[in-house]
Amino acid sequence: MPVRAATDGRFKYIRSYIPYRQFALRNYYQWGMPSNKAWDKLVLGGHNTNPDWAQTFNAHPAEMLFDLEKDPGELHNLSDSPEYAEVLAKMRKALSEHIRSTKDLGFFIPTSRVNTTLYDKVRKEKYPLNELYNLVELAGTAKASDASVFEKALSSQYPEMRYWASVGLAQLGIKGELQVCPPTLLTLMNDADPYIACEAAYAAAYLGETSKGIERLNHPAKEADRKVGYSLLECLSLDKTMQPAIRTHLADLKEKAEILPRKANEDAGLMARGILVNLGEMDIKDLHGPESYKLGLKLNHGRRPMVPLPN
């Protein structure tokens, strides 16, 4: 999930290019911490009364602007405030120029990096980087009038264009600015690239094809690509409107949560367990399974007490 930021020392501008992707996707280390598990339980259990504490579990704005002097914790977004419109425009322009001047390669999907050096590739092949950047920036802030741009890009020869076109359509679906799923998007769910196929499926889930989209995310074309679909399914499972459709796959998810690997960040079994936690079908304390708890006890046995902390 690409995110870029810029600051002039006083204000900080953050641009999230896939704003519907929550920050609370679990990784192995952080969610092994008792504090993170308690945070999960507080918010997902419905006990939280502070909106700030729930931010990481929700979709977020495409653009955020913070006054670092008054708000060093970066909690109060000023991007919608008319008073700061000039500051926002200045920071947006600076960041947009920066990704172009540096030829930022962070918007390419993982499969485009296999057996190639992107730095050389985009220069030798004269890749249309500016066209890609335009599409990327449009996707996160998409309006209904942009739908035709995304639909055209769905058929691009470039995998990244197809991917970001799917992101743009997903954003429109989530915002309720597009209700009908373009036929090309449904076709794209069978794209040979799992990142494109799964992002298209995610978009379809918000464009009237919820069952088809979730079915595709839960059933990969290749087993090795299961983690790609599960990652997006974990995002969807934080949306209560999507949970009933995901529950139709509950038996399969529970089976995969037990039989698939769950010892590393991108292990599909760990992702399946995260989805079950979001659905309220598993307690967060069981996310890593009993074997991880026992291993932790074994690794830490005999270590000297850390209270008080060493000087």
Task: Show the residue positions of the predicted features.
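Long, internal low-complexity/basic segments
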Residues: 47-62, 70, 78-311
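C-terminal, low-complexity/hydrophilic appendages and adjacent surface loops
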Residues: 1-80, 86, 118
